[in-house]
Structure formats: structure tokens, C-alpha cells
Amino acid sequence: MLRKLFLMVCAIAIPLRGLAPLQKALYITTEPPIKPYEALWRAVSMVESSGDSLAYNVSERATGIVQIRPILLRDYNARTGSRLRLSQMYNPKISKRVFLYYATKFHYSDYERIAKKWNGSGYKTEIYWKKIKKQLQKQVKIN
């Protein structure tokens, strides 16, 4: 009886041995992070500067890929305790940090409100939002 049981276990286990991995290893994969504002960031970048991180608007002293003005940077520095300079806004990573601060701080769930607030106030924000929407729609077609 014991011998039959042993033979049955061997009959089942030996073929399965070919299916088991030879190395004993655990593989852990990570999913890419969720970036809820990435599409909006790209759209604003295209509308503000055509994606040019070295863009500069002389009349407004707006700097970088998303055209950050001195008054906005002063507000950001005051709120966060940072000491960023306008010249650093040519670096897209730093500009993005400033942009994301405002996107997440005030209107995190609504792209339209974020975009309009980024642009300013008044009726021209409607025109601006239409440009942003157009860029967002282009991204959807590409992706």
C-alpha cells in the first residue's frame, strides 16, 4: 500500500518537475506610476511655448516651457518656502514642479479649471481652454 502511494506520488510529481522553474527566484515587477496631470502638462507646454523650454516672453517676463511669470514664482516660493529663481524656469523639471504644485493644490480634479487658472482670469481663459482642449485631443489621437 505504501509502495503504491509512493509510486502514485512519483507518477504525478515527475512530469510536473519539467514545468517548475530551475532557479528558485521571486520576480517582483512594478507598474509605472500614475501621472494624472501628464497630458495636461504636455498640452499647456505646447500652448504656452510650443514645447520650447527656452521660451521667453519679454513683455511679461514669462519664462520657460509653461511661461512662468515672476509674480507666480514669488507666490510659489512664499507658499512652499522654496527659493527658486526665474532663470531656473528654463529647466522643464523645475517648471513642472511649480506647475504641478498649483494643479494639485487648487483644482486637482478638473483640467479646465486648472488650465484657466494657470492662464489668468477673464474671458480670454475660454479661448485658452479651447487651445488646451485641442492639444489634449491631439494626444488622445496619437496615444
Region locations from a protein language model:
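Cell-wall glycan
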Residues: 27, 47, 66-72, 139-143
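N-terminal secretory targeting signals
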Residues: 1-36, 143
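Alpha-helical segment that forms one wall of the substrate-binding/catalytic cleft
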Residues: 70-139
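Extracellular/periplasmic catalytic domains that process cell-envelope and extracellular macromolecules
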Residues: 34-38, 59, 109
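Alpha-helix initiation/capping motif
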Residues: 30-33, 58-61, 88, 92
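N-terminal, post-signal-peptide region of Sec/Tat-exported proteins
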Residues: 53-81
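Short charge-dense sequence patches
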Residues: 42-58, 81-90
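Short, functionally critical alpha-helical segments immediately adjacent to catalytic or ligand/cofactor-binding
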Residues: 35-52, 68, 99, 113-121
